[in-house]
């Protein structure tokens, strides 16, 4: 993997991430395709309509169903899903904790029961890499010990030491495999405790292809999250991509870009779409509300997305009320277009040294109304 830093504007960064299946301009937002697809969308929607170059899939879910060996036998995740861009896969540790009963944390890994059939499984640092090799992920995340917030200091310290140990074991294992197209990212933990974040960075070896800031958006305040990012991002190697996991709102993303983060993922645009919330530059709207029943205008004037060029708010209101499956697709296409355009415009602003004014102007309009 090759990462080229093209421009900076204060702490904001614009770069190019060269992966085996695509070249990705950063900052980048990665749509979340947990099961190997973005809910309600297919590869043609993602590539031909949205132009997405990098999407996220979930190791835990694909391991349990259909099984990584099935995906491997069918040509890997790209051929299986017919997505010819790149895939980042997370390690599955978070899902093992959040979806399973009777999770047991051990020094060598995580023992969990499948949420599908109750069968028992062990995720170790090597095991989750083997799964991701079978999937043929472009970017693989290491297994980590995620802690919900707030958490006692002792538990945070235990988490970062275990996460760093697992990351370093993963790096050594990966070096033996000679798989240059499968890139490995470390994950920095430590909650909102700044000394713990510094310790986590210090314990994690150099030599990873990228570094993620994990363990945020799990119960802390927005101010705590931003303070943690502001502290952690400058500690990470300047020549490697920085990934903020699971974040977030348009405001969160712009704030984090301004603090030096390059990569983002979140279910928000698609989950909100399915629940009737649509993003516009003037704030969010709830398409299920009565005023849209006779509204013959698009979700947003001047929006170039597939949905806005073809359909009215009245039609989307009708589809949502009628519980039609097509609603989820049209709404998701709009919200993902909004997010992808947001980071694209942020990138252009960084290249032109006007990021702060771009952010200020965007947020002023975005907060002007929500209805």
Curated annotation (Swiss-Prot):
Its cofactor is Zn(2+). One of its GO terms (molecular function) is metal ion binding. The keyword Transmembrane does not apply. Zn(2+) binds at residues 303, 305, 308, 334. Binds 1 zinc ion per subunit. Pfam families: TGT. One of its GO terms (biological process) is tRNA-guanine transglycosylation. Pathway: tRNA modification; tRNA-queuosine biosynthesis. GO terms for cellular component: cytosol. Substrate binds at residues 90-94, 144, 189, 215. Its EC number is 2.4.2.29. The active site is at 90 (proton acceptor), 265 (nucleophile). It comes from the Bacteria. Belongs to the queuine tRNA-ribosyltransferase family. Homodimer. Within each dimer, one monomer is responsible for RNA recognition and catalysis, while the other monomer binds to the replacement base PreQ1. Catalyzes the base-exchange of a guanine (G) residue with the queuine precursor 7-aminomethyl-7-deazaguanine (PreQ1) at position 34 (anticodon wobble position) in tRNAs with GU(N) anticodons (tRNA-Asp, -Asn, -His and -Tyr). Catalysis occurs through a double-displacement mechanism. The nucleophile active site attacks the C1' of nucleotide 34 to detach the guanine base from the RNA, forming a covalent enzyme-RNA intermediate. The proton acceptor active site deprotonates the incoming PreQ1, allowing a nucleophilic attack on the C1' of the ribose to form the product. This is Queuine tRNA-ribosyltransferase. It comes from Helicobacter pylori (strain Shi470). The gene is tgt.
């Amino acid at each position: 993997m090759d990462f080229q830093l093209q421009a900076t504007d204060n702490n904001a960064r614009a770069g190019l991430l060269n992966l085996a299946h695509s070249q990705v301009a950063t900052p980048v937002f990665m749509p979340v395709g947990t099961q190997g697809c973005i809910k309600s969308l297919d590869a043609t929607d993602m590539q031909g309509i949205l132009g997405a170059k990098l999407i996220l899939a979930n190791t835990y879910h694909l391991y349990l169903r259909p099984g990584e060996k099935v995906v491997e036998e069918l040509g890997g995740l790209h051929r299986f899903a017919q997505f010819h861009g790149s895939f980042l896969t997370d390690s599955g540790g978070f899902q093992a904790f959040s979806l399973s009963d009777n999770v047991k944390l051990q020094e060598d890994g995580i023992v969990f029961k499948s949420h599908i059939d109750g069968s028992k499984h062990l995720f170790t640092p090597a095991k989750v890499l083997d799964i991701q090799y079978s999937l043929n992920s472009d970017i693989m995340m290491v297994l980590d010990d995620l802690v919900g917030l707030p958490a006692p200091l002792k538990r945070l310290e235990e988490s970062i030491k275990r996460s760093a140990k697992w990351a370093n074991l993963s790096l050594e294992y990966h070096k033996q495999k000679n798989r240059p197209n499968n890139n490995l990212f470390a994950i920095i933990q430590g909650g909102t405790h700044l000394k713990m974040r510094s310790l986590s960075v210090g314990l994690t070896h150099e030599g990873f292809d990228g570094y993620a800031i994990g363990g945020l958006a799990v119960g802390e305040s927005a101010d705590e999250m931003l303070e943690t990012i502001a502290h952690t991002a400058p500690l990470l190697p300047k020549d490697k991509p920085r990934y903020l996991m699971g974040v977030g709102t348009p405001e969160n993303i712009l704030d984090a870009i301004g603090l030096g983060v390059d990569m983002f993922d979140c279910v928000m645009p698609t989950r909100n779409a399915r629940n009737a919330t649509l993003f516009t530059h003037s704030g969010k709207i709830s398409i299920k509300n009565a005023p849209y029943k006779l509204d013959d205008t698009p979700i947003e004037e001047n929006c170039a997305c597939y949905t806005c060029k073809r359909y009215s708010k009245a039609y989307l209101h009708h589809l949502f009320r009628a519980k039609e499956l097509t609603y989820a697709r049209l709404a998701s296409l709009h919200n993902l277009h909004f997010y992808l355009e947001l980071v694209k415009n942020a990138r252009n602003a960084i290249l032109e040294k006007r990021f702060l004014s771009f952010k200020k102007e965007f947020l002023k309009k975005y907060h002007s109304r929500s209805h």
